[in-house]
């Protein structure tokens, strides 16, 4: 009996020694490699939300769960805004508060700080839709630069988002997209050449300040019929600014069936020119518009046959980037749980640090908190895409969020289920605490 107790004691001592050696050898970040990542922890997902905020979210997603109601709201809201009816307050307290950081940088700073408290970073986006005209394009450039300068003063804002349609005329991009001499970088119309040169100068100014301030610039993807000049411009900026570290990123939409080959070609160009390739990998945002236009104009749709092909190429694209992580810096922008888990597991399988500077996860503010905050807790570099701007100006962005949440299969239901689950958990915890206090006071 005594020898058995001695054996038990020895076993415990060995366990303690092993634990001490293990924790000294591995940092907290490394320990996460031995724990299975899960996106089901709602306590972690919504720790930054009050009960009142969760209840507001439950109401909003519950409303958007009815596709017909969301469709009516999308049509009516812009009209009501134009009539001058007092709808600003309602919008501010519902959909605006859910998906937008604030109307000003100062308001947005509070949201960014709150996210930072939970190790979540921010991709800052001035969410105002583009207004055409050279003067407006110059103003947009100046605004992007102001956002970069502000981001540089904050500890958790490593990126800003830029839409080329904010600094370039849509018609010009469309013309250049189909120009026969586009690949050589030459166009036949002197006036449009001069206009394009001004676009290049605006983008250079933005990237130059970003490089000085060490802030990443994520160039948004657009419709396929204006995307080619954007791709060319992004390569030009990367060639200049991505020599030593990644500053400029282009967005690749994998719902297009040609984008995997494009990614490989992009990588080949980066190798030849000696720069780090920066890419933001997304599924895509203009599917219905792309298919409708292709059908109307009688050309083959650039969109994948179905979602399974998109998912396959998205996951293949992420894997390709991770396999070439020394040469490609990647922002994985996805609300798909499987894709995020798969990417995280790939990093672990290859022994790549969760906070490697060439890998970053991101989700939209107001959506998929279960992914964002659980990734952050596990030590991954992850951010919220956080737009800001006056309510009237960000209405188009908000309407897209409403449309996406009502059309993406199961997205709204998933958000609603997670919020309800967390509210139930909090009620249960509160009841248990109350019961414990009653029993203690009675004793």
Give the label of every model feature segment.
Residues 13-24, 30-443:
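Positively charged, amphipathic and often flexible ligand-engagement surfaces
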Residues 6-9, 29:
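Cationic, low-complexity basic patches in intrinsically disordered or flexible, solvent-exposed regions
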Residues 4-7, 22:
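Short, aromatic- and cysteine-enriched interfacial helices/patches
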């Amino acid at each position: 009996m005594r020898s058995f107790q001695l054996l038990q004691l020895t076993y415990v001592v060995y366990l303690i020694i092993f634990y001490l050696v293990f924790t000294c050898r591995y940092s907290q970040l490394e320990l996460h490699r031995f724990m299975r990542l899960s996106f089901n922890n709602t306590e972690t997902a919504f720790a930054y939300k009050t009960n009142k905020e969760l209840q507001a979210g439950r109401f909003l997603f519950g409303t958007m769960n009815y596709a017909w109601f969301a469709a009516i709201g999308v049509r009516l809201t812009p009209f009501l805004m134009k009539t001058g009816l007092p709808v600003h307050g309602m919008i501010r307290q519902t959909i605006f508060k859910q998906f937008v950081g604030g109307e000003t940088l100062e308001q947005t700073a509070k949201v960014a700080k709150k996210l930072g408290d939970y190790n979540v970073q921010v991709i800052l986006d001035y969410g105002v839709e583009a207004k055409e005209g050279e003067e407006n394009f110059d103003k947009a450039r100046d605004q992007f630069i102001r956002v970069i300068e502000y981001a540089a003063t904050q500890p958790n804002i490593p990126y800003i988002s830029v839409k080329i349609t904010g600094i370039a005329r849509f018609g010009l991009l469309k013309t250049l997209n189909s120009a026969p001499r586009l690949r050589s970088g030459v166009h036949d119309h002197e006036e449009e050449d001069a206009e394009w040169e001004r676009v290049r100068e605006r983008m250079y100014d933005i990237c130059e300040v970003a490089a000085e301030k060490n802030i990443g610039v994520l160039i948004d993807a657009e419709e396929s019929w204006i995307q080619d000049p954007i791709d060319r411009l992004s390569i030009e900026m990367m060639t200049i600014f991505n020599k030593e570290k990644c500053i400029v990123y282009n967005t690749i939409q994998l719902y297009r069936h040609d984008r995997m080959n494009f990614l490989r070609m992009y990588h080949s160009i980066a190798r030849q020119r000696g720069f780090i390739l920066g890419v933001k990998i997304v599924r895509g945002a203009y599917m219905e518009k792309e298919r409708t236009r292709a059908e109307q104009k009688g050309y083959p749709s650039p969109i994948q046959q179905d979602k399974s092909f998109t998912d396959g190429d998205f996951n293949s694209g992420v894997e390709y980037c991770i396999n070439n992580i020394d040469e490609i810096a990647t922002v994985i922008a996805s609300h798909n749980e499987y894709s995020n888990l798969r990417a995280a597991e790939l990093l672990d399988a290859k022994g790549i640090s969760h906070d490697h500077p060439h890998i970053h996860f991101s989700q939209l503010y107001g959506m998929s908190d279960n992914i964002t905050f659980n990734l952050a807790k596990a030590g991954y570099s992850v951010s919220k895409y956080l737009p800001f701007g006056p309510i009237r100006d960000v209405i188009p962005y908000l309407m897209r969020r409403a449309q996406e949440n009502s059309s993406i299969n199961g997205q709204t239901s998933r958000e609603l289920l997670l919020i309800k689950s967390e509210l139930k958990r909090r009620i249960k915890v509160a009841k248990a605490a109350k019961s414990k206090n009653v029993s203690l006071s009675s004793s």
